[in-house]
Amino acid sequence: MLVPTVIEQTSRGERAYDIYSRLLKDRIIMLSGEVNDQMANTIIAQLLFLDAQDSDKDISIYINSPGGSVTAGLAIMDTMNFIKSDVQTIAMGMAASMASVLLSAGTKGKRFALPNSTVLIHQPLGGAQGQQTEIEIAAREILKTRKRLNQILADNSGQTFEKLQADTDRDNYMTAQEAKDYGLIDDIMVNQPK
C-alpha cells in the first residue's frame, strides 16, 4: 500500500512525514483493515505514547474495519481503558465485529459515527478440528468469548445482556442512527458547512 507523504514547513526548512505520523501529531490514530496482533501492537504503542505525552488531551481513533482477532481487539480495548487520556472513537465506513466492540468502548459521550457508516454486531466466529475433546474445548472457549463480548457490549450500550445475546445471534447491521439508538455510539458527526 502506498502511504502518502505530507511536507510541512518548519523553522529549519521542510519536513516530510508519512500521513499517519502527521495525524499522530494531532493525536489521531487510524484503525483500518483487519484487527490482528500486528495492528494491535501498533495501536497500543500509539495510545501509550500519546498518553505519556499528555494524558489531559483526548486521543481520537478513526475506525474503518471488518473486525478480526478477538484477543488483539481486547488488548486494544484494555489499553484504551488503562490509559488516563479520554479516547474518542469515530466510525467511518464500517465498524464490524470486533471493531464495533472497540467503537463502543470509547469514552462515554465521545463515541461517534459519520452519517453513512455501518456498524455490525454478531457472535464471534470460530472453528475447530482435531479429536472430539479438543473440539469440545474449542466450542466451550467460543461460548465463553461470546458471553464476554456480549457483556462488554451490554455494559457499553446500556442494553441488557439477554438482548445482546438475542441481537448478536445473527449478523445485525446498523446505520449510524440505529447504532446511536442502540447505545453503541453517543452521536452522529454531521458534515461541516462549506
Swiss-Prot record:
Name the Enzyme Commission number(s) assigned to this protein: 3.4.21.92
The GO molecular function terms of this record are: ATP-dependent peptidase activity; ATPase binding; serine-type endopeptidase activity
List the keywords (alphabetical): Cytoplasm, Hydrolase, Protease, Serine protease
Listed under GO cellular component are: cytoplasm; endopeptidase Clp complex
- Which Gene3D superfamilies does this one have? 2-enoyl-CoA Hydratase, Chain A, domain 1
Active site at: 97, 122
Q: Where in the cell is it found?
A: Cytoplasm
InterPro entries from the entry?
Answer: ClpP (IPR001907), ClpP/crotonase-like_dom_sf (IPR029045), ClpP/TepA (IPR023562), ClpP_His_AS (IPR033135), ClpP_Ser_AS (IPR018215)
Q: What is the top EC class of this enzyme, as a single word?
A: hydrolase
Its BP terms in the Gene Ontology are: protein quality control for misfolded or incompletely synthesized proteins
Give the catalysed reaction(s), semicolon-separated: Hydrolysis of proteins to small peptides in the presence of ATP and magnesium. alpha-casein is the usual test substrate. In the absence of ATP, only oligopeptides shorter than five residues are hydrolyzed (such as succinyl-Leu-Tyr-|-NHMec, and Leu-Tyr-Leu-|-Tyr-Trp, in which cleavage of the -Tyr-|-Leu- and -Tyr-|-Trp bonds also occurs)
Q: Name one Pfam family in it.
A: CLP_protease
| PROSITE patterns on file | CLP_PROTEASE_HIS, CLP_PROTEASE_SER
Provide the function of this protein. Cleaves peptides in various proteins in a process that requires ATP hydrolysis. Has a chymotrypsin-like activity. Plays a major role in the degradation of misfolded proteins.
Family under the similarity heading: Belongs to the peptidase S14 family.
Oligomeric form and interacting partners:
Fourteen ClpP subunits assemble into 2 heptameric rings which stack back to back to give a disk-like structure with a central cavity, resembling the structure of eukaryotic proteasomes.
Protein's name in the database: ATP-dependent Clp protease proteolytic subunit
